[in-house]
């Protein structure tokens, strides 16, 4: 096994640079890939926003929501239909693309069509999956499990860097707090940055999720997305992860968490202002 000493302090996905001391970047898009037309519509809108605001943006969407609450819930278009759409978004819009992988056997094929492979929170300790993702050489974004302490992510990241891939992002998405509830401990952000050495991302939309809270699906408290996002950016992070949709209330998954696309630009403007303040040089007022 090849060993990389540490995670890269700056990770590049396409033209987007992530670093805890760099200007804020964003990972955004709908929860799942619903259709080619829908994906291109949202990706085009997000690119326009990112261009206006001069912020690096990675487009995210999922070809398979493999951990839905109910077995009858919609899961996405699947691998075969999704990969050409990912490739089209990259080639026609010039946006880097992120998607989840769920099994080691998927990594090499998916890596041909995307820039970032994402490890779902529930799978963050699955060594074979982490090693297969690392072997592609792509950026690997690991969601911290809802069951992990922030310092435990050091072992997760080390599995990837130890396989010779230093290009790792570590994402905070809340921790279980009783039944159907997640909370966000903002101390975890600097702890993860210090213990992993990786750029840290805050997932502002899954952090307000209420897992299984609607019986056969998860609920969420979308109104708290801006609150938690502002707090995380004020602490200081490399990027924010925000799921957005033109009509969240009719989305096939995670609708209660997602930010309406019409509100996305305003939210991002405010977060960029917080980021500028958080990363400004300290002023000696003595």
From Swiss-Prot:
Belongs to the KdsA family. Pfam families: DAHP_synth_1. This is 2-dehydro-3-deoxyphosphooctonate aldolase. It is found in: Cytoplasm. GO terms for biological process: keto-3-deoxy-D-manno-octulosonic acid biosynthetic process. Its EC number is 2.5.1.55. It is an enzyme of class 2 (transferase). It catalyses: D-arabinose 5-phosphate + phosphoenolpyruvate + H2O = 3-deoxy-alpha-D-manno-2-octulosonate-8-phosphate + phosphate. InterPro entries: Aldolase_TIM, DAHP1/KDSA, KDO8P_synthase. Keywords: Cytoplasm, Lipopolysaccharide biosynthesis, Transferase.
């Amino acid at each position: 096994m090849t060993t990389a000493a540490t995670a890269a302090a700056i990770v590049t996905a396409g033209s987007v640079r992530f670093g805890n001391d760099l200007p804020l970047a964003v990972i955004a898009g709908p929860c799942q890939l619903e259709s080619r037309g829908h994906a291109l519509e949202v990706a085009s809108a997000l690119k326009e926003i990112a261009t206006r605001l001069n912020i690096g943006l990675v487009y995210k969407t999922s070809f398979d929501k493999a951990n839905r609450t109910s077995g009858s819930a919609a899961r996405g278009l699947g691998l075969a239909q999704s990969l050409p759409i990912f490739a089209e978004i990259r080639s026609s819009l010039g946006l880097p693309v992120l998607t989840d992988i769920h099994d080691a056997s998927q990594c090499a094929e998916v890596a041909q069509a995307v820039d970032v492979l994402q490890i779902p929170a529930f799978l963050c300790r699955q060594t074979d999956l982490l090693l297969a993702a690392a072997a592609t050489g792509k950026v690997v974004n690991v969601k911290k499990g809802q069951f992990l302490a922030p310092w435990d992510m050091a072992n997760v990241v080390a599995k990837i860097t130890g396989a010779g891939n230093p290009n790792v992002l570590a994402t905070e998405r809340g921790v279980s707090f009783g039944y159907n509830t997640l909370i966000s401990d903002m101390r975890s952000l600097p702890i993860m940055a210090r213990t992993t050495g990786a750029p840290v991302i805050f997932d502002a939309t899954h952090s307000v999720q209420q897992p299984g809270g609607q019986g056969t699906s998860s609920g969420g408290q979308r109104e708290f997305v801006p609150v938690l996002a502002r707090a995380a950016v004020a602490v200081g992070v490399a990027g924010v992860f925000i799921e957005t949709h033109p009509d969240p209330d009719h989305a096939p998954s995670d609708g209660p968490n997602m930010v309406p696309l019409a509100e996305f630009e305003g939210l991002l403007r405010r977060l960029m202002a917080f980021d500028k303040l958080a990363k400004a040089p300290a002023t000696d007022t003595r």
